[in-house]
Amino acid sequence: MFYELRQYQSLPGKRDELARYMEEVIIPFQVSKGMVVTGSFTGETEENLYVWIRRFESEAEREQLYKAVYGSDEWKNEQSPKIGELLDREKIVVSRIVPMPKSVLH
């Protein structure tokens, strides 16, 4: 099992709109495709920061879920263009992280 820690920088003044779109559209859509989202956050002091975490049981599951989400017409035609208006794609940081054996997330 592993997690993706995904950090996004909104375009200036767009963080609240980005967070709302993630919470109301992107996350529910991805969950409907089988994605497990374990948390989402905004930066307390970083005014443009939005962070979310997804969990995968295996690389095979991640590949299957990526295909289901990012290969869909809804993602390609609606969500991806909209999200591009809200965040700086060049500043996206995705870290794959593995919980330690004693972590409650293990």
Q: Language-model segments: which ranges?
A:
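Specificity-determining recognition surfaces
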Residues: 98-104
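Accessory recognition modules or surfaces
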Residues: 7-8, 43, 48-63
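Basic/polar N-terminal segments that are highly enriched at the extreme N-terminus
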Residues: 1, 105-106
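Short coil/turn motifs at beta-sheet boundaries
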Residues: 1, 45-47, 87
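Short, surface-exposed ligand-recognition loops at beta-strand->loop->(often short) alpha-helix junctions
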Residues: 10-19
